[in-house]
C-alpha cells in the first residue's frame, strides 16, 4: 500500500470574511465554522480563538487536538467511519495542513482534560505549543450527559478540521512524503536480509470517557487486528479520550504517530516494517488475556523478528503492557516497550503497576509525577476553573499570584 502525503505549510492563522489558504496563511471565516459546529443541537454556543507559538496564552481544558487533512486521491476520506463513509484508507494522496491544528476546548467533559501553554516552561512539555492553533470553545446545552457532550465536542472538532482540510484540495503541496509497505510475501522477497518488525499500538479503551475509535468502532469492542501503517495517516484512529493529558494520544498524535514515522524512516534500510498491530486496553482480566493472546499469536503468524509496543494510559493498562510484552517474547519475538512512569514526586516509587523480567528493553517518556509550576498567562482561552480538579491538580494548585503548581501530566 502506497500513500503520498502532501504538506501544506501554515505559518499563520487569521480570521477573515472568506476561508482560504494563501501564501502560507490560513484565513478562517468565523461564521462559516460556527455554523458547522452549531449543526449539533447538543452545543448551545461556540466561540473561536487563535493561539500562536510564543504568545502568553493558556488553553484549558483541552479535549482534543486535530490536524486538518483532505483525501485528494484514493479510496475513502479522512476520518473514515466517523466523518467519511467506511472504506479502507491509507493509499493514494492526502494533503495535510502542517504547522497548525484544531483544538477543542471549553467546559470540562470529564476530569482529565489538560493544559496547553503557548510559552513558558509548560510549552516545553507539549508539541502543540509549536503550532498555530484554531481553538474551538464549546458550551453545551443544559442537562446534557457527559458522554453526549464528549461526542458532540469530538465531532465538532473533526467537522471543523475536515472543512479546513478541504481548503487545500486544489493547492500544490510545499513538500511530499511517500510511504509504502508491501504484502507479507512481497516484503519478504524484497527485503530478504532485513529483520521483520511490526508496531504494536495499545489503544485506550477502558470506557467511561476513556475511549479510542478505529474506523468509527469503539476499540473496546474489537480484538487485536492488523492495519497498514499508512491508514492512521488518513485518520483511521481517532481519540475520544478524557484520560490524563500526558497519557492520552490526541487525534493529532494518531495522524502523526512518531513510532510509525520513525519505523518508516528505517523501512528498507535497516528493517522491513511489516505492519501495525492494534490492540486494546479493556478493564476486565478476561479481555486483557484474550487481547494479549491474540496479539502474541499475530506476531508469531507474521513471523516477526521484533516489535515495538507502545502504551496509552497508565495504572490499569500497565497490566496489558506487560502481558503483551511477556507473551510476545515467549513467541521468540524481541520486544521493546514504550511507556511513561508514575514514580512519585521524588522519582523513587515503582514506576509501573506491573512488571516482568521479559520487559528488559524499555523506552521511557519520563516521570509524570514530576511537579511543574506554570506562570500566569496574559490570556486564557477556555477557563482555569478546573485546574484544581483535572488529573494532576489539587485544591492548592491555583496560587493567589495566578501561577499553577501541578504534576506535569496536566500538560496536553
Residue ranges, per PLM feature:
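Membrane-embedded hairpin module used as a gating/binding unit in multi-pass transport
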Residues: 188-280
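A general structural motif
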Residues: 256, 282-296
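Gly/Ser/Thr-rich loops at beta-strand to alpha-helix junctions
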Residues: 204-205, 310-319, 341-344
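Extended, charge-rich low-complexity interaction segments
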Residues: 362-394
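A short helix->loop->beta-strand "cap" motif at the edges of active sites that frequently abuts
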Residues: 330-336
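Long, compositionally biased, glycine/small-hydrophobic-enriched stretches that function as flexible linkers
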Residues: 1-223, 407-412
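Glycine-rich, charge-decorated loop segments at or immediately adjacent to ligand/cofactor-binding or catalytic sites
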Residues: 342-360
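Charge-patterned, long linear interaction tracts outside catalytic cores
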Residues: 392-412
